[in-house]
Regions:
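Short, hydrophobic/aromatic beta-strand segments
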Residues: 53-61, 69-72, 121-122, 173-174, ...
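Short, solvent-exposed loop/turn segments enriched in Ser/Thr/Gly
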Residues: 38-44, 106-108, 119-126, 185-189
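Surface-exposed binding patches on compact interaction domains or structured appendages
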Residues: 26-27, 54-110
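Beta-sheet-dominated interaction scaffolds and their linkers
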Residues: 23-55, 60-61, 97, 173-184
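Short proline/glycine- and polar residue-rich coil/turn motifs
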Residues: 98-105, 222-231, 242, 258-261, ...
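Short aromatic-acidic-glycine turn motif
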Residues: 63-87, 134-138, 209-220, 258-260
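Terminal connector regions
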Residues: 113-163, 243-272
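Short edge beta-strand/loop segments characteristic of extracellular beta-sandwich folds
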Residues: 44-48, 188-196, 236
């Protein structure tokens, strides 16, 4: 007897910290890409179906952690520490399931309720927006040797961090071990973003002349969360743009998180 098994392949847009004002995967667009909220506050996220057919999206709150390479990994709620899982009890959201017509958008409301006894600090969970697959659109099953047919249906999803700050957590950023290299004809900047304190840092990384104002290369939306003391960043550099400028170079990290007050960290970097 031939059997058919439907398997879902989840394609989630959360591997790296977001670098745009909108996060997108498939026909799903979410804005903003991050929320920072205080105790007993509220916010909203706009979900937009950019496709040409009606789609249903499920919304859930999940745990994620950052690695020193900047990737975002899933955390099992059952094994998470009490401190890491605390945000799940602080954050509320509605609705939890929406159906959008083509080019239609809807607002998801986010709320925070912090108990008076909650210790100060930064707490974080991630909102996962995931398209519900249409069974009718599933790929035709491919027959296997044992007579079982398997069909893979991609499920597109986007995650955004929801950061809750209780009290006034502090944080600071600095740069270390900056170096430029050329491999296979491609220039690349490597640098370690160092983070201190109990608050995440977030901003823009720039390579520029030591006395200049125009960046040679830029990457926006760089975050380092409290679980990492440092994050390694790799920034591709256009060799033509690099050759057009002379003199010493520097790397600059400009914090765009309002809590940082526009703090700037700089370090020199030698030419390759």
């Amino acid at each position: 007897m031939k059997r058919t098994m439907m398997m879902a392949a989840i394609v989630a847009s959360h591997a790296l910290a977001p670098t745009m004002a909108q996060a997108a995967a498939g026909d799903l667009l979410v804005a903003p890409t991050r929320l920072i909220m205080g105790a007993n506050s509220g916010g909203e996220v706009v979900v937009n179906n950019t496709g040409d057919k009606a789609t249903t999206y499920r919304i859930s709150l999940v745990l994620r952690k950052m690695t020193e390479q900047g990737t975002i990994e899933s955390v099992d709620e059952a094994t998470a520490s009490q401190r890491d899982a605390a945000a799940l009890d602080l954050i509320t959201y509605a609705p939890r399931k929406i159906t959008l017509a083509p080019q239609q958008s809807q607002t998801v409301r986010i709320g925070v309720r912090v108990p008076p006894t909650m210790p100060g600090g930064e707490y974080r969970a991630h909102l996962l927006f995931r398209a519900v697959p249409d069974v009718a659109d599933a790929a035709a099953p491919q027959p296997a040797a044992d007579g079982m047919s398997i069909s893979l249906t991609p499920i597109y999803g986007v995650t955004i961090p929801v950061i809750v700050r209780v009290g006034e957590p502090t944080g600071s950023a600095s740069l270390n071990n900056a170096r430029l290299s050329v491999q296979d004809g491609q220039a690349q900047l490597d640098v370690d973003l160092m983070r201190a304190g109990d608050r995440s840092v977030y901003g823009t990384l720039e390579l520029m002349q030591a006395d200049g104002k125009t960046p040679i290369a830029t990457i926006k939306g760089i975050a380092a969360y409290p679980e990492v003391a440092q994050r390694h960043i790799m920034l591709p550099v256009d060799r033509t743009a690099l050759a057009r400028v002379s003199g010493p170079l520097k790397v600059r990290f400009v914090e765009t998180d309002p809590a940082a007050g526009g703090a700037v960290s700089e370090t020199a970097v030698a030419r390759p």
